[in-house]
């Protein structure tokens, strides 16, 4: 396999009082929003103060960090941490959202695309780069989320952002499906990288799978399933099942 196995660092997360709070590592399920996860934990475990440290799109899975109580003060530090993702893009088609949230809107040829062309595209997208966020994103323009404007069909001017992609590996052995592993800075949109790969190889691309495997020192391998966390926490708190 192209990708090296993930290393799991032991964390120092231990049970604490509700006031002190805790850092919760969850594996976000497919189709759930980050706020779905927050609300599930908040209501099921009767937690007053809780927030998440970085949004995951509904069609993405993987590591989601929640902080409760006084630990919510640490959210900013986790949001700013380096992120790692694995996923799959498919060449030859595009969607407005660059993933499967929206229907295909165009098809492109792929016969001309070589391994060398793909590697060159990846190299161009590695390092400190200027990136345009997707129109279907939570970026705010004029006080409103871009995805709301997109769903109304409203045209907006999107400004590029400076982000850092420190690692961009691909496996094109199942072409036109391309598996990838990316390590990047805060604010990087993986869908934008996928879109730009398609453009650079003179075709189109969309993302069919995405999983966040790491946030800073925290790894998906150490995360709990949401229902498992809820059951364990309710038992700790003496709440009825």
Predicted regions and their residues:
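Catalytic/RNA-binding core of pseudouridine synthases
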Residues: 2-241
């Amino acid at each position: 396999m192209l990708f090296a196995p993930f290393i799991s660092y032991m964390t120092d997360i231990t049970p604490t009082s509700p006031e002190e709070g805790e850092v919760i590592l969850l594996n976000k399920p497919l189709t759930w929003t980050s706020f779905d996860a927050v609300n599930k934990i908040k209501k099921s475990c009767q937690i007053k103060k809780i927030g998440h440290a970085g949004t995951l799109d509904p069609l993405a899975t993987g590591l989601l960090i929640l902080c409760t109580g006084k630990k919510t003060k640490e959210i900013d530090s986790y949001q700013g941490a380096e992120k790692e993702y694995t996923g799959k893009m498919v060449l030859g088609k595009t969607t407005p959202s660059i993933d499967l949230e929206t229907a295909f809107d165009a098809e492109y040829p792929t016969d001309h695309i070589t391994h060398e062309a793909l590697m060159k595209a990846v190299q161009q997208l590695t390092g400190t780069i200027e990136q345009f966020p997707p129109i279907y994103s939570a970026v705010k323009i004029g006080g409103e989320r871009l995805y709301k404007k997109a769903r109304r069909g409203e045209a907006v001017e999107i400004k590029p952002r400076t982000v850092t992609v420190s690692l961009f590996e691909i496996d094109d052995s199942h072409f036109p499906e391309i598996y990838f592993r990316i390590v990047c800075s805060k604010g990087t949109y993986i869908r934008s990288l996928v879109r730009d790969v398609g453009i650079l190889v003179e075709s189109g691309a969309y993302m069919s799978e995405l999983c966040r495997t790491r946030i800073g020192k925290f790894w998906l391998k150490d995360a709990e399933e949401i229902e498992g966390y809820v059951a364990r926490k309710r038992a700790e708190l003496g709440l009825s099942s």
